[in-house]
């Protein structure tokens, strides 16, 4: 059976239709609308993709099991938006709504870099940090559907203020926006290029940034004990040349490294399609 999935991003909505073999056979993109127009745009995209008996949607933020957006920092005004219930009523099909990083993790686990594993964590390093967790072959959602908000894992008590209103969140130290702050406004590409040329300031920034990435990955490993950690998001292209440094610092930060098999650190393979593909794959769970 074909499936349709839509990934809602901060600037665009990306929809795909998958055939029975899981290949993308149709795509459509729309600018992300204001929160009060989101349901209408998602319904239009679903129709343009040909429709089917179910729809999967990935949305940034805190999503309830019923498909209600409780809060989404990257979508102004998106508080208590009833996406799932409204789409079910409007389209007359089954609708499954999940956090966007969770559906990307599901895609990488089912058909991407973590395929074949039973225990995996995906970390998306972008403007912020998102994630998804698979344990025992099951996607983990938690009691309220909020599992995987790893960017708001506290790594420094009373540290830098986060957009969530708290302090010391991991994404304030290991995200794309954190790298820009650390470097004094440089892009990730420019920072790593300068470090490769031997510029001392850039090398210091990269050392601190990779250390914060490693600290967070080690904490996730100590909690989840995964076989593989998939790293995706916009920052991954910048750090790919220093993954050996990240891996070494990650190993140093692990609890009881001599008694455990270290999880593999791999980069995501599905690119910007991961969220939409994961949404389509997860639609069958509706």
Model feature map: region roles:
Residues 1-54, 63-68, 85-93, 107-117, ...:
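ATP-binding/phosphotransfer module of carbohydrate and carboxylate kinases, centering on a glycine-rich
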Residues 104-110, 130-133, 152-153:
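Adenylate-forming
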Residues 146-149:
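Structural signature of FAD isoalloxazine-binding scaffolds in flavoprotein oxidoreductases
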Residues 28-30, 73, 143:
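Short hydrophobic alpha-helix segments
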Residues 11-12, 103, 127-130:
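Conserved A3 ("GATE") glycine/threonine-rich loop of ANL adenylate-forming enzymes
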Residues 68-80:
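A charged helix-plus-loop insertion that forms the helical arch/lid used to bind
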Residues 7, 56-60, 98, 122-128, ...:
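Short beta-strand segments
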Residues 72, 96-110, 122-123:
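Glycine/small-residue-rich loop that forms an oxyanion/phosphate-binding "nest" at active or ligand-binding sites
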């Amino acid at each position: 059976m074909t499936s349709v999935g839509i990934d809602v991003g901060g600037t665009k909505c990306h929809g795909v239709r998958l055939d029975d073999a899981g290949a993308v056979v149709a795509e459509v993109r729309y600018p992300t609308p204001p929160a009060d127009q989101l349901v209408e745009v998602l319904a239009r995209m679903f129709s343009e993709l040909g429709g089917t008996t179910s729809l999967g949607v990935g949305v940034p933020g805190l999503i309830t099991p019923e498909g209600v957006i409780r809060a989404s920092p990257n979508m102004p005004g998106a508080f208590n938006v009833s996406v799932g219930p409204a789409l079910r009523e409007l389209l007359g099909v089954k609708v499954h709504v999940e956090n966007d990083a969770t559906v990307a993790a599901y895609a990488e686990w089912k058909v991407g870099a973590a395929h074949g594993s039973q225990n995996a964590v995906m970390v998306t390093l972008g403007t912020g940090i998102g994630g998804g967790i698979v344990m025992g072959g099951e996607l983990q959602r938690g009691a309220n559907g909020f599992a995987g908000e790893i960017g708001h894992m506290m790594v420094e008590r009373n540290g830098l203020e986060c957009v969530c209103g708290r302090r010391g969140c991991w994404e304030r130290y290991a995200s794309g926006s954190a790298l820009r702050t650390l470097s004094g406004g440089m892009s990730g590409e420019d920072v790593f290029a300068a470090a490769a040329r031997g510029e001392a300031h850039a090398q210091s920034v990269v050392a601190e940034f990779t250390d914060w990435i490693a600290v967070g990955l080690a904490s996730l490993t100590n909690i989840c004990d995964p076989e593989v950690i998939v790293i995706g998001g916009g920052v991954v292209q910048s750090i790919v040349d220093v993954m050996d440094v990240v891996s070494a610092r990650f190993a140093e930060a692990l609890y009881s490294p001599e008694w455990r098999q270290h999880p593999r650190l791999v980069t995501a393979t599905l690119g910007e399609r991961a969220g939409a593909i994961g949404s389509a794959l997860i639609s069958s769970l509706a």
